[in-house]
């Protein structure tokens, strides 16, 4: 490597060689290190450039194959270790191989959608304000605050027994319940039909509700199945919250010299949650990659794929170079939407009929290729191996002609 006489000269060379983010970090590090001589700082810059150049893929390197191996091999260990659901806090979280498959298959919705919601400073430091934000987000129906619904065959009036503690926990008032019942169009609250009682020291509110004849015709008054259908609708009456958010838990996160409260959310509705004034939209994330692509764009989805795969591997105690994950994320997102790796995505869109046939549904792929008169260019690795030809990677990417002996 060229010898540099001054620090400025070495940094100028680094500016042309290193990525912008790495260059800025190098400059900041060198400038704030007062204990190093200029010669030492030049050595740091040279070593950074040398390390970066050594990290670059060589021309002809089969980076796709290496990336596949780098994730596939740890995947066999994940199968043995974590092919199950593990309880984290109060939620079931998909871990290990099942979650990895969800990510690379680009599932429309994950089996266990979760959101990690960070709050703005005025809410993040106050537990009560954080709880209030959680109550505002959680989708609350009548079923979540009642003990039971008492009813008798032949009587349209049912008694909805509401637990006052449940109401307080969910941030619901009696007026909110009455308004929700009025909007349900299942019937009406009878006049003076609200009573407060106490049973065994537990406060309860009983609401007497008359089911409309449209929901329960006279001929169905003695049909228990008809009653249960209406009562199920009654339990699902919406009171407040954001659709898709099933449960919210407040968690305290400790930093080096500070703390903050954040929300772990079971369910996902990124668009509406990010619009809330309490939410810090810069840090809040979801594990639903398709939703991220729709709400925040394809670049955000690419970052989410990298972070989700990285988290799955780390949870299993595995360490994979992030550049392999970046390559896979690029492959899944470069068309502008999130596509799966399999035959309905990356593999299925390959121009080579032999490469497509080698993955799945071989006969169908060959049949369709013949019908449409597709040509095999032998440009990829798979098709060349099938045909017994040297793949165009490594030394096979260079065409050589033997020189004839000169007379």
From Swiss-Prot:
Any one GO CC term of the record: cytoplasm
GO MF annotation terms: DNA binding; DNA-directed RNA polymerase activity
Keyword vocabulary terms for this entry: Cytoplasm, DNA-binding, DNA-directed RNA polymerase, Nucleotidyltransferase, Transcription, Transferase
A UniProt-annotated Pfam family: RNA_pol_Rpb1_5
Catalytic activity: RNA(n) + a ribonucleoside 5'-triphosphate = RNA(n+1) + diphosphate
Source superkingdom: Archaea
Enzyme class: transferase
EC number(s) recorded for this UniProt protein: 2.7.7.6
A single BP term in Gene Ontology: DNA-templated transcription
Main localization, broad class: cytoplasm
Family matches, as InterPro entries: DNA-dir_RpoC_beta_prime, RNA_pol_Rpb1_5, RPO1C
Subcellular location: Cytoplasm
Gene3D superfamilies: 1.10.150.390
Subunit and partners: Part of the RNA polymerase complex.
Record-linked HAMAP family: RNApol_arch_Rpo1C
Chain's role: DNA-dependent RNA polymerase (RNAP) catalyzes the transcription of DNA into RNA using the four ribonucleoside triphosphates as substrates. Forms part of the jaw domain.
Family label: Belongs to the RNA polymerase beta' chain family.
Record-linked PANTHER family: DNA-DIRECTED RNA POLYMERASE, DNA-DIRECTED RNA POLYMERASE III SUBUNIT RPC1
Record-given protein name: DNA-directed RNA polymerase subunit Rpo1C
């Amino acid at each position: 490597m060229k010898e540099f006489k001054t620090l400025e000269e070495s940094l100028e060379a680094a500016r042309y060689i290193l990525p912008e983010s790495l260059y800025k970090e190098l400059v900041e590090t060198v400038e704030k290190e007062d204990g190093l001589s200029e010669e030492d700082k030049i050595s740091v810059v040279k070593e950074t450039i040398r390390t970066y150049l050594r990290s670059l893929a060589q021309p002809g390197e089969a980076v796709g194959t290496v990336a596949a191996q780098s994730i596939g091999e740890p995947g066999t260990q994940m199968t043995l270790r974590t092919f199950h659901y593990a309880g984290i806090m109060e939620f079931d979280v998909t871990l290990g191989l099942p979650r990895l498959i969800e990510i690379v298959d680009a599932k429309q919705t994950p089996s266990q959608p979760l959101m990690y919601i960070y709050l703005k400073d005025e809410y993040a430091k106050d537990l009560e304000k954080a709880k209030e934000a959680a109550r505002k987000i959680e989708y609350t129906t009548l079923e979540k605050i009642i003990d039971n619904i008492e009813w008798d065959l032949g009587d349209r009036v049912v008694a909805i027994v509401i637990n006052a503690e449940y109401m307080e926990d969910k941030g619901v008032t009696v007026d909110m319940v009455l308004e929700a019942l009025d909007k349900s169009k299942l019937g009406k609250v009878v006049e003076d039909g609200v009573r407060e009682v106490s049973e065994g020291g537990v406060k309860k509110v009983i609401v007497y509700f008359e089911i409309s004849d449209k929901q329960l015709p006279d001929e169905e008054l003695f049909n228990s199945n008809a009653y249960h259908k209406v009562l199920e609708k009654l339990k699902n009456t919406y009171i407040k919250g954001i659709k898709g958010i099933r449960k919210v838990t407040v968690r305290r996160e400790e930093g080096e010299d500070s703390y903050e409260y954040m929300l772990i959310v079971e369910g996902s509705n990124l668009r509406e949650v990010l619009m809330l004034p309490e939410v810090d939209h810069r840090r809040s994330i979801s594990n639903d990659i398709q939703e991220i692509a729709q709400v925040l764009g394809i670049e955000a989805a690419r970052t989410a794929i990298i972070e989700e795969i990285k988290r799955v591997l780390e949870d299993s105690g595995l360490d994979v170079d992030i550049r392999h994950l970046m390559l896979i994320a690029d492959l899944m997102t470069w068309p502008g939407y999130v596509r799966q790796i399999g035959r309905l995505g990356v593999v299925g869109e390959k121009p080579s009929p032999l490469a497509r046939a080698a993955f799945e549904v071989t006969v169908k792929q060959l049949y369709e290729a013949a019908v449409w008169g597709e040509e095999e260019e032998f440009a990829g690795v798979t098709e060349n191996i099938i045909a017994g030809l040297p793949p165009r990677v490594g030394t096979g990417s260079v065409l050589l002609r033997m020189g004839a002996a000169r007379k």
